[in-house]
Amino acid sequence: MSSVFANVVRAPEDPILGVTVAYHKDQSPNKLNLGVGAYRTEEGKPLVLNVVKKAEQMLVNDQSRVKEYLPIVGLADFNKLSAKLIFGADSPAIQENRVATVQCLSGTGSLRVGGEFLARHYHEHTVYIPQPTWGNHPKIFTLAGLSVKTYRYYNPETRGLDFEGMLEDLGSAPLGAIVLLHACAHNPTGVDPTIEQWEQIRQLMRSKSLLPFFDSAYQGFASGSLDADAQSVRIFVADGGECLAAQSYAKNMGLYGERVGALSIVCKTADVASKVESQLKLVIRPMYSSPPLHGASIVAAILKDGDLYNEWTLELKAMADRIISMRQELFNALQAKGTPGDWSHIVKQIGMFTFTGLNSEQVTFMTNEYHIYLTSDGRISMAGLSSRTVPHLADAIHAAVTGKA
C-alpha cells in the first residue's frame, strides 16, 4: 500500500541552516563553519553568558515560581522592559501608553505576528524589503498574507550602501506601503545608514506615509552600545508617528534556543494601542496560544536588576568588541598576503556578518578545497572566527580570488 504522501517532493535544505548540515558531515579536522549567525568564543565554542547563568540560578532558587501558562501576550514585565530597551526609558510613546507590546517567538515569530496583523488590519498589503536581506524575510511576509517587493540597498561596486537607489525606490513606492528596515547591523551586508542618512530616510518615508517595520535582531551587538544601536528606531518614534519593531534576544543575550522576542507597535494614541493589542491576541491565540515562560523570565530578571543589567552590557560589549577585532585581524591577514582588491569593507561593515563580495563559485572552491562553510552569497559570520582560524580563512580567500590553490 503506497503512502498518501508518496507524491510529496523533497524540499531543498534551508540556504543558511543547510550550511551547518553540510559542515557536520565533513570529517576534516580543519573544517570551519561561518554560515550560521551564532556567537562563538575564541575557542570556537558556544557561549552562555555569565549573567544568564546568574539569572537562571535566581529563577531556580525562587520557590514561588510555577509553570503555569503565560497570558496570550506573554510576560508583562518582559514586554514593558523590552519596549524600554528599544525605545528608551524616557520615550514619550511609552509614557503616554501608546505602545502595544507582545512577547513572541524570537525575531521570526515577532515578524510573522506583525505581518499577519498588518495583513488583517492595514489598508496597504505591500511590504518593501531591502535587496539583499535575511533569507527568511520574504517567506515570513508572503505566508503572513502580504505581497513582497524589494528596494535597492547594497552597492556591490562600493560594497557599501546604495543610498540614492534606496531613496529612489522608496520614493516611488505606493503611498502607505510597509517598509522593512534593519534597525542596525544589516544582515547579510553589515552595511548601515549613518544617522544623517536615517534622518533623510525618515523624512522621505513620513512624507509618503510609508509604515516602518523595524527588525532589531542585534541591538548592542553592532556597536557594543544598546542606545547607539537603537538610534534608527528612536528617530522614527520621536516624530510622533507610528511604526512596528520586532526584537530578538537570540544574539544579544545568547538565548538562541529559548526563542525570546517581542513585537511592539507604536500607535498615535493609548486608545488605539489598546485596540491593537486586543487584535494581536487574536493573531497569536490560534497560532501558538501563548509564548514560553523560561526565556522571557531570564530576560526580565536581567533587565530589571541594575547589577545584572550592568553586567550584561559589559558581556555584550565584550562580544561586540571580539567581532570588531576579528574584522581587523582578517583585514590585516589579507593585506599581509597582498590579496588583490580592496578589502577595507571588512572593517567598515558592522555586526555579526561580513558580505565579502565573493561569488558562489569562489564559495564552492573554499568549501571544497579548504573545508570552510559559508552561504553561497559570500556572507561570513565573523562571530564564528577566532585568531586561530583567521589565517586559514585568509589563505582560502586569497586562493579563491587569485585562482591559486
Curated annotation (Swiss-Prot):
Reactions that this protein is recorded to catalyse: L-aspartate + 2-oxoglutarate = oxaloacetate + L-glutamate
Modification sites for N6-(pyridoxal phosphate)lysine: 251
One Pfam family name from the record?
Aminotran_1_2
What InterPro entries does the entry give?
Answer: Aminotransferase_I/II_large, Asp_trans, NHTrfase_class1_PyrdxlP-BS, PyrdxlP-dep_Trfase, PyrdxlP-dep_Trfase_major, PyrdxlP-dep_Trfase_small
Q: Is Zinc-finger set as a keyword in this record?
A: no
Instruction: Tell me a GO biological process for this protein.
Output: biosynthetic process
- Gene3D superfamilies tied to this protein: Aspartate Aminotransferase, domain 1 (3.90.1150.10), Type I PLP-dependent aspartate aminotransferase-like (Major domain) (3.40.640.10)
GO CC list: mitochondrion
Positions bound to L-aspartate: 37, 134, 187, 379
| Needed cofactors | pyridoxal 5'-phosphate
What's the chief localization of this chain? cytoplasm
**An example molecular function term from Gene Ontology annotations:** pyridoxal phosphate binding
The UniProt entry's sequence similarity note says:
Belongs to the class-I pyridoxal-phosphate-dependent aminotransferase family.
Miscellaneous information on this protein = In eukaryotes there are cytoplasmic, mitochondrial and chloroplastic isozymes.
Q: What is this protein called?
A: Aspartate aminotransferase, cytoplasmic
| Organism for this UniProt entry | Daucus carota
